[in-house]
């Protein structure tokens, strides 16, 4: 009878070891999963939080608008207070005239840049915010004066949409672009001297929360 008990003990001990190993494995997997989620969450939130911190450095308050209908679907897009919100960007229309380079430097210090127009819809939105008696610098220039225009954010110019007035750009000495209202063609782009003073349009990306 004693000899018959040994196989049973071996079987029980093996079963317990297997169960213990399974429990330990599950705990390790759970720990790894939680750690992975924490890393993913931190990675996902780090960039928006950094961007939010940057905006707060330049602006005392933000205006956020929600998207989605259910609480779980809501996504908040934030712009500096008093800026115009459209698509994934925020816009500020300047009330002061300045040189192209100074306007761009001022906007860089605000965490933004002169506007880059990528679509007709964006252009149409912007022109509804403008004064027809004024001219506004864009983030578009020809730094070498060799007809190689480039956007301030390195958006490829040749493949991008263009809204030049007829016969513009027309002078190699005019290295900067503005948007201006002319009859009968209405709003369009014009090349101007960079050291002439114009109003300007500022753009920055929304921060999503």
Swiss-Prot record:
GO molecular function: calcium ion binding; carbohydrate binding; D-mannose binding; pattern recognition receptor activity
Name recorded for this polypeptide: C-type lectin domain family 6 member A
Binding locations of Ca(2+) 2: 168, 170, 174, 190-191
Source taxonomy: Eukaryota, Metazoa, Chordata, Craniata, Vertebrata
Residue intervals annotated with topology Cytoplasmic: 1-20
Primary gene name: CLEC6A
Record text about domains: A short stretch of the intracellular domain (AA 8-14) proximal to the transmembrane domain is required for association with Fc receptor gamma chain.
The organism of origin for this protein: Rattus norvegicus
Residues with attached carbohydrate: 131
Stretches of the chain found on the membrane's Extracellular side: 44-209
Residues noted as binding alpha-D-mannopyranose in the record, renumbered to the chain: 168-170, 174, 182, 190-191
Cross-referenced CDD domains: CLECT_DC-SIGN_like
Quaternary structure and interacting proteins, as annotated: Associated with FCER1G. Heterodimer with CLEC4D; this heterodimer forms a pattern recognition receptor (PRR) against fungal infection.
